[in-house]
Each structure stands twice: as C-alpha cells, then as structure tokens.
A protein has these predicted regions:
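Internal alpha-helical transmembrane segments
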Residues: 2-46, 152-239
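Alpha-helical transmembrane segments forming the membrane-embedded cores
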Residues: 215-261, 389-522
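Juxtamembrane extramembrane loops of integral membrane proteins
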Residues: 3-9, 29-35, 39-145
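Extended, hydrophilic extramembrane loops/domains of integral membrane proteins
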Residues: 104-145, 169, 306-345, 368-376
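Membrane-proximal low-complexity regions enriched in glycine and acidic/polar residues
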Residues: 40, 44-88, 238-298, 307-310, ...
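Membrane-interfacial, low-structure loops and terminal tails that flank and connect transmembrane helices
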Residues: 186-192, 381-398, 523-526
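Alpha-helical transmembrane segments
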Residues: 154-169, 352-369
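Membrane-water interface of transmembrane alpha-helices
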Residues: 169-182, 363-385
C-alpha cells in the first residue's frame, strides 16, 4: 500500500484547523451553489417541460428565414432599434422556438431590452417583455450565482468559490498521509463518525478534479471584474480594454455614432448560409449584430458542436460588404482567445453532451454529501465533555441550521417545478409568482426544520416531503398541459418525458429509501 509522507505536527494542526474553519464558514453557501448548479446544468433540457408553448415540431435551423423574423418582430415592436445589439437564437431539438433579444426606444435617449419567442414554422411572435414567460430553470441558475442578492451576489459566489479552493488544498494537505488508507478502508458499516470520516476523505479524493474545476472557474466568473485590473496592470500596461479585446475579439470592433444607413447589404440569412457552408460540422447557436442597417454595422455568428472543449467559434462580418472582419475558427483558436470559452465549457459541462452533464450532476451531489459529512464530523468531534454545555448547544444549533437549510432544498426545488405548472402560463407577472412560491416555500420548510432537534428525523422528514412532491410533478404536468407521461413517450417528446420520469423515479426511490433504510436515531444534543 502506498506510503505518503505526513506533515509535521505543527503544520498539520494549522492545516487541519484552517480547513475546518474555512469549511464551516462557507458550507452553507457552497451547498446552495452546488445543489442549484447541478439542476442548472439542464436548463436547455428543461425548456420544453417548463414551457408548453415550445412543445412543437422542430424546424431545421437552416430552413428558417431569419430576416423574416426581424421583420415580424418589427411589426410587433414598432420602436425596435436595430442599431443597438440584438440577436437571434436558431431553433434546436431542445428549444424548438427561436429566441429574439433586442431593444426598443422609450424616448430619444432611453431604450429598454425585450425578449420575444418566434415560432420558426409560422413566424408567430410571442412577446415576453423584459422577462421571459417561463423563468424556472433561470431562477435556479441565478441562485447558483446568488443573483437574487442585488449587486454583491455574484461577488459573494466568487468569494465562496475562492475559499472553497482554499479548503480543498488545506483538506488535501491535512489528509495527505491517510488518503490511501482511508480510500481502501471505506465501508458503510460501523459507527457513523467513521463512515462520515472515511467517506469524506475517500469521496473528496475521487471528486478532487471536479471540485478544482468548479472552485477555479467559479472564482474567476464571480470575481472577474476584480481580477481585470491586476491583469491589465501586469500584462497590458494598465489598459483594461486590451485585456477584454484579447479574450473577446468582438470588443476590438469600433463603431461610429455618425455612421450612415445603407440598404440591401449583408443580411442575417447571408451570414447564416456563409458560416454553415464553411463549417458544416458546427451548428450555429447564436447570431447577433451591432449597428445593423448602418455602414459600419457588423453581424456575428457563433458556432459550437457541444462536443469538443475548444469546438466553438465566432465569425464577424461587415454589414456593408459581407467581408470577414474576424474569424475565431473552432479547434484553431489562439490560447488567449479560447481561454474564456474553455472556462465556460468546463463550468457548464457543454463539451460532452447529455452524458457528461449527468456525470457532472452526480459529482455535484456527491460534493454536497462531502460538505454534509464534513459538518457532521465537525459536530461529532465537539460533542464531548471537554466542551461546555453552552459550546455543545452552539455546535448543535449550527449543525441543525445547516441541515435545515440544505436538506430543505430537495423539496424546495420540487416546489418550483410544481409552481411552474400551477401558475397560469399567460398570467401577467408570472415569474414573480413562481419565484415567490419557491422562496417562501423554501423558507417555510427551513423554519419547520429548525423545530426538529433530531438530525436523522430532520433528514427523514425532508426526504419524505421531497419525494411526495416529486411524485406530484408528472401529475401536475399532465393535469395542466394534457401531456401525461405516457403520452409524451408515445409522441416522442423525450425532453418532457425525461423530466417527468426522472421526478417519478426520484420520488419512488426516496420513499423506498425512507421505508427500508432510514431510521430515526436518537442523538444527544448536549
């Protein structure tokens, strides 16, 4: 068996206590980040389930008239400003509707953003305003970055990720000597303290690469603005614009406020056909433009096959003549220009298809367990007579708050799925009501859990509640949309079917787990 050299006692104690303190401080927020992020991975796959209007026959993106989409949007939005940045997302099997993001003039000096959904078969435009009609998966995604907290939320998520990286390294150094022994000695039998300790070390070692990816990319995304200045100072003589241009080629394109309008120039259809012909193996995922209709306007086409880590590209064409201004060719990009896209792919698991997302999801759930086992190790180690009753009660309260916050996320996520079906799709301000049901439901579940002093009872209750709610998800979808689980399978609506089936499977599994495995263990709190 491999023998690893241990740290010196003093250094080991420093690393151990640093790992413990940093882990306890960030565990509340970090669990939310990973749990919400695990579901946010499937935003595209959830789209048809949460939006019944998107359950239509998929139209080949190459057969869509994108210039006609622009004209149809202009009819619905007469004040649409084409000189501002606007874009179109072509239809896919996951998202059969075409997205349109644009701006319209409020007055001479003010514009407001809007979102529209276009049926690529009929070119019917459904206006969603500033917020899309369905927001369920995006709410979960925003929770991953704490976007619900104004201004500082994204920075908070970045700081948590940074300290997570710190906790990873201190934990690795702390358990370095015992990693091999604990890994091979792992068992689900024996005392809970030993199970928690062995699994914390073993699973932490197995998921180490995954955790490093998320700690690094999460910190970079959350603290990107704070990292911009030192990067500009060290590598670009203080010029922040040069940093942005090195990473994002489109930022290097300059536009004039005095540009004149021109007619009959390069169009969206022209750009789509040109890129498709030159890159047939790379689907077009987004088309956007700046100063469209003006002599210095541009049209940018982004491609990505969703399989390779560097299999994305970007092509910028001049609106006036269709000449290529910039070309970021897939698999052939420079290091600086591909760095940001690689980080994005690593974080969102968009480089290996659905199977990779499932692996990411499982690893995220394992990471959530690692955090919980760490908290239980911390609490068990302090439930001794060497600590005063006051200290032990404090440790118990911290543990109970952690378990109530984290374990209640299971039924809370089921609640937002149910709310997405219960709240009428055409109700004005629908997003507000769905989100309110989710967060208020989560808050009620959390507060309820604080009254359960027994940890195993708390976990058991949340699993039962969450499992029952999961079983209601396919029922709600069938009742409110008419697309029952068996009908979606027959109609080959596989994305809708997979969500209902997964919810049903989780619900049944949770109830079986509760019946045959989970037992309420009497744990002394002081």
């Amino acid at each position: 068996m491999m023998e690893l050299k241990a740290l010196k006692p003093r250094l080991h104690n420093i690393m151990f206590h640093t790992h413990t303190v940093s882990g306890i401080v960030i565990c509340f927020a970090l669990f939310v980040i990973f749990y919400a992020g695990a579901f946010a991975l499937f935003m595209d796959e959830l789209y048809q389930w949460e939006n019944p209007n998107a359950r239509i026959t998929t139209v080949d993106a190459s057969k869509v008239d994108y210039d006609k989409i622009i004209e149809k949007v202009k009819e619905v939005h007469p004040k649409f400003d084409s000189t501002k940045q606007f874009g179109i997302v072509p239809p896919t099997a996951k998202q059969p509707l075409s997205y349109f993001y644009g701006s319209e003039k409020v007055n001479d000096s003010t514009t407001t953003r809007f979102t529209a959904y276009v049926n690529p078969a009929s070119y019917e435009v459904n206006v969603a305003g500033e917020e899309p009609t369905t927001h369920m998966s995006r709410t979960i995604y925003q929770l991953h970055f704490f976007r619900q907290i104004p201004v500082v939320g994204i920075y908070l998520s970045g700081l948590v990720s940074f300290f997570f990286l710190f906790a990873i390294f201190t934990g690795l150094l702390t358990h370095w000597k015992n990693i091999s022994n604990k890994f091979y000695a792992f068992t689900v039998k024996g005392k809970w303290k030993n199970i928690w300790t062995n699994s914390h070390i073993s699973l932490g070692f197995i998921t180490l690469p995954f955790q490093l990816i998320y700690a690094i990319t999460g910190a970079l995304f959350g603290l990107s603005i704070l990292l911009l200045l030192p990067t500009a100072f060290l590598a670009f003589n203080g010029d922040t614009a040069s940093v942005i241009e090195a990473i994002n080629p489109s930022a290097a394109v300059k536009y004039s406020d005095d540009a004149k309008p021109i007619e009959g120039a390069f169009s969206y259809n022209d750009a789509f056909k040109k890129v498709s012909a030159e890159n047939p193996d790379y689907p077009i995922i987004y088309i956007l433009s700046r100063n469209y209709g003006l002599e210095d306007g541009t049209i940018t086409v982004n491609v990505d096959d969703g399989k390779g880590i560097a299999a994305n590209g970007s092509f910028i064409f001049g609106y006036k003549d269709g000449n290529t201004i910039s070309a970021l060719i897939p698999e052939k990009s420079s290091y600086s220009k591909s760095t940001l896209n690689v980080l994005i792919k690593l974080h969102y698991a968009t480089y290996g298809g659905l199977f990779l997302k499932i692996i990411y999801f499982i690893l995220a759930m394992v990471t959530c367990y690692i955090m919980t086992s760490g908290v239980m190790i911390w609490r068990t180690a302090r439930n001794k007579k060497t600590y005063t009753d006051k200290q032990r009660r404090f440790h118990h309260k911290v543990t109970k708050c952690y378990l109530a916050l984290t374990m209640s996320m299971f039924p809370a996520v089921a609640i937002i799925f149910l709310a997405n079906k219960i709240v009428p799709i055409d109700l004005e301000g629908r997003t507000f009501y769905v989100n309110s049901i989710f967060f208020l439901g989560w808050l009620i579940l959390l507060i309820t859990g604080l009254f359960w002093d027994n940890y195993s009872k708390l976990n058991k209750n949340y699993i039962v509640i969450g499992s029952v709610l999961c079983l209601l998800i396919p029922v709600a979808n069938g009742n409110f949309t008419g697309d029952w689980i068996w009908r979606t399978l027959i109609n080959q609506q596989y994305y809708v079917f997979s969500v209902d089936f997964t919810a049903f499977f989780i619900g049944i599994s949770g109830l079986l787990l509760n019946k045959y495995y989970l037992k309420v263990i009497d744990v002394k709190t002081v």
